[in-house]
A protein has these predicted regions:
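Glycine-rich active-site/cofactor-binding loop and its immediate structural neighborhood
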Residues: 1
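Cleft-lining beta-strand/loop regions that shape enzyme active-site pockets
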Residues: 5-198, 233-241, 247-255
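Metal-dependent DNA phosphodiester-chemistry modules and their immediately adjacent helices/loops
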Residues: 63, 158-160, 195-226
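Short acidic (Asp/Glu) and glycine-rich catalytic loops that position anionic groups and cofactors
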Residues: 97-101, 221-228
Length: 256
């Protein structure tokens, strides 16, 4: 295609529209050195950009937890209640965080799926054996579950199974919840694509009933420690909810 000039104060991003995954020649100019040179770039899609932003966000949270806890706690974010997220969490807590004293489980902004039973089992381990080889302790058992303390973060943007999973976590007394209340949206939804494939209907078809006859749907889940992230702190890159979760879990561990 023909070359396009970029003028002062012009938003050049629109020149990269519809060029994702297409090698694009860019000419750059440094007004101070008066040097001009060319680079070949590979534009990415909005979806890829969002994935990179998400990965950066998770790495920032993990680094903060590591710093605030002096390396005592690990951090995992459950992006969605599905298999890929579970595998990531499983790998992290039993891999790089295996020797940590506790785990901060972040479910904020999770749109749901079905993972409440898996998370319940994974984080409710209780040590019953220690493997010893020639006098050296090798590992605790169960070795495929988390046997140490944890705490869970939730927020107003949690939806569906991201309401149900924190509810199960609290109901089974695995740990405490930190953050903001979650609307009662724990249902099973049937997703139906219409003749026009751009139209998709999600119809709640299954409710989750407690022994007293009430349903999780429309039952707001309150955190044990209520704390909001204000816009004033978010724009500074500060995560008040996360810092509170770290402080609360460390206090719990130090009591033992």
């Amino acid at each position: 295609s023909a070359a396009s000039d970029v003028y002062k104060r012009q938003d050049y991003s629109k020149l990269l529209n519809n060029k994702a995954k297409k090698k694009t020649l860019v000419s750059l100019y440094d007004p101070q050195t008066k040097e001009r040179w060319e680079e070949v770039v590979l534009p990415i899609s909005n979806g890829e950009l969002n994935n990179l932003l998400y990965t950066r966000w998770v790495k920032q949270r993990a680094a903060d937890v590591d710093k605030w806890s002096n390396g005592r706690l690990g951090y995992v974010h459950i992006q969605s209640m599905g298999d890929p997220s579970f595998r990531s969490v499983y790998s992290d807590i039993l891999g790089k965080y295996n020797d940590r004293e506790g785990i901060v489980i972040d479910t904020r902004f999770n749109g749901g799926g079905r993972l409440h039973e898996d998370i319940e089992i994974l984080f409710s381990g209780e040590k019953y054996l220690t493997q010893v080889t020639r006098g050296r302790e090798a590992c605790d058992m169960p070795s495929r579950r988390w046997n140490k303390p944890s705490i869970m973060l939730q927020c107003e943007a949690n939806y569906s199974n991201a309401h149900g999973t924190p509810w199960v976590y609290k109901h089974q007394q695995i740990g405490r919840l930190v953050g903001m209340p979650v609307p009662g949206t724990m249902t099973t939804v049937s997703w139906e694509t219409l003749q026009d494939p751009t139209l998709v209907f999600g119809t709640p078809i299954t409710g989750y009933r407690l022994s007293d006859g009430s349903y999780l749907e429309n039952t707001q889940l309150e955190p044990d420690v209520k704390v909001a992230n204000s816009p004033e702190t978010v724009v500074k890159g500060e995560d008040t909810q996360l810092r509170t979760a770290v402080q609360e879990l460390l206090k719990e561990i130090d009591k033992k």
